Regions:
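Outer membrane beta-barrel
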Residues: 57-61, 92-104, 111-274, 292-314, ...
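Surface-exposed strand-loop-strand hairpins of Gram-negative outer-membrane beta-barrel proteins
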Residues: 86-92, 100-121, 284-287, 330-338, ...
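The canonical Cys-X-X-Cys-His
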Residues: 46-56
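C-terminal segment of classical bacterial N-terminal signal peptides
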Residues: 21-34
């Protein structure tokens, strides 16, 4: 199928599904109660999921964010796992998956891959809650499945998150906090970083936040890959969007002057999960990766007139600094890399969230990234230099109380634009604009049912993106980014229509 015909096909499918969603939601709106989702919390406390979520899981509203920041506690005796109101039938575990139809394509240099079919997105088994007063825990397990995804093959099991969080440690140093303030909390384990806006809580399922996962030298792709591309080696595999093992100190305090909240977090992260290529590996040896360095990530926010997701506004600053391992352990090549060979990298950014009328949320972030020259020197790149780039995204969410025309509650509409712009490549033979990214994501969700037990939503998502100059067909010298007349762009798009449910 020719590219322009394929685009018309995608658009026709999207228009048809939107019309179907509108009709179905209109018919069901008179039958379904307006109950607006880890359902385990709703079961525990006996309230509907809309107490903690905007009209649609998994995005948290102001109350839900505060509940999370306070260690999944309301501040009552009902928080305790031994409370008499919690029956033996309560199990603090939820499961979530999405079933439906997905179509995806990716093309580079006039050649590409197209997939499509019915399937599911995998399975998340989630458990969060309280072990005792001011002691929280979280576990997310993704089981290995022989037919996971939409025809993409088997998946491996992984413990995506596993942590314990100790709350209100300030009391041990003689500081008495006000009700609702949790000034000093310690989290240990593997967890999502306190990024400006949680990717795990995003309602989009098929499109990542580009700046959270961007790596200089590696062509950006989303959902599927497999086309021939050009790249250069970079030992730094750090992504702020990936869960990391470490320890985090964090706190939240009400600020009367702004009628909002001040939040902070500082995490120390181990590099044993780094998977970048290392120099010094003997031929024929499967060398170890990772390392024993400690990297840091921090985030501070101040909100005004609320938490800044449903009411009020919020501003923040965040950053990461660390050293990426670059050489194998000469004494034990199959062991983890040595700490002393690490080379520095940094990420610095700002974020903002604006709300209007309790229905609109405009939010976004900008980040500056830099990987040091010696990372690329370690890979044998001639005339290596620092790799520097800027990333950003902006998203508009609209959750109307009643959708105009159809007079139906329970809708969520989103649009997000992701952008990456490179200033300099670690390998100077690659063009400045190599791996620049423009990504557009459109989302419509209708919430069929949300209660204290189950959640189900109709989900329609479309993503289209372009990654500049990463083609390989016109490369003059193998291993370089010099093309004649130019390197081709990578073009990708994905459409997902399905039912997203949790229980």
């Amino acid at each position: 199928m020719k590219p322009h015909k394929r685009k018309l096909c995608y658009r026709s499918v999207i228009v048809g599904l939107l019309a179907l969603l509108s009709f179905v939601s209109y018919e069901w709106s008179s039958l379904v109660p307006n109950a607006n989702a880890i359902p385990a919390f709703a079961r525990k406390y006996g309230f509907s999921c809309n107490v903690c979520h905007v009209p649609g899981f998994p995005k948290l509203n102001d109350t839900g964010n505060i509940f999370r920041d306070q260690g999944y506690q309301l501040g009552t005796d009902g928080d305790l796992p031994t409370h008499e109101g919690i029956t033996m039938g309560f199990w603090p575990v939820s499961m979530r998956t999405t079933v439906g139809y997905q179509a995806a394509s990716v093309r580079t240099d006039g050649k590409g891959i197209t997939t499509g079919g019915f399937g599911f997105t995998g399975l998340d088994i989630l458990s969060f809650g309280s072990l005792h007063r001011d002691i929280a825990f979280g576990i997310v397990f993704t089981p290995g499945l022989g037919s996971a995804g939409f025809g993409t093959g088997a998946s491996d099991s992984d413990l995506e998150s596993a942590f314990v969080r100790l709350m209100r440690l300030e009391r041990f140093v003689g500081v008495k906090s006000e009700p609702g303030d949790y000034l000093l909390n310690l989290k240990v384990g593997k967890f999502e970083l306190d990024v400006p806006f949680s990717e795990k809580r995003s309602p989009t399922l098929n499109s990542v936040f580009a700046m959270y996962h961007y790596q200089p030298g590696t062509p950006f792709t989303s959902t599927i890959s497999g086309t021939s591309t050009s790249s250069y080696l970079n030992p730094n595999s750090f992504e702020i969007g990936e869960n990391s093992p470490g320890a985090e100190v964090a706190g939240i305090k009400k600020t009367a002057a702004t009628s909002g909240y001040f939040r902070y977090s500082l995490a120390a992260l181990s590099t044993n999960t780094f998977s970048g290529p290392l120099s010094g590996c003997p031929p024929g040896t499967t060398c170890g990766t990772g390392g024993r360095n400690v990297n840091f990530f921090g985030h501070m926010t101040q909100s005004f007139g609320g938490y800044g997701i449903v009411t009020g506004h919020r501003i923040g600053v965040f950053g990461a600094y660390g050293n990426a391992p670059t050489m194998v352990n000469a004494t034990c090549p199959t062991c983890q890399a040595v700490a002393g060979s690490g080379q520095p990298f940094s990420r610095v950014g700002v974020d903002v969230s604006l709300t209007f009328d309790g229905q609109w949320n405009l939010f976004g972030a900008m980040m500056r990234g830099n990987d040091s020259k010696n990372m690329f020197v370690s890979q044998g790149i001639v005339n290596a230099q620092n790799a520097s780039w800027n990333g950003a995204f902006v998203e508009l969410d609209w959750y109307p109380t009643l959708l105009p025309l159809f007079d139906a509650p329970g809708w969520l509409f989103s649009y997000r634009y992701d952008v990456i712009r490179n200033d300099r490549q670690g390998d100077p033979t690659f063009a400045k604009n190599y791996n620049n990214v423009d990504s557009h994501t459109f989302l419509a969700r209708y919430y069929i049912h949300q209660s204290s037990r189950t959640d189900i939503a109709l989900h329609l998502e479309y993503n289209t993106y372009r990654t500049v100059g990463v083609g390989a067909a016109n490369v003059v010298t193998p291993g370089s980014g010099t093309c004649a007349p130019a390197c081709g762009n990578l073009l990708g798009q994905t459409m997902l229509a399905g039912l997203d449910f949790a229980f």
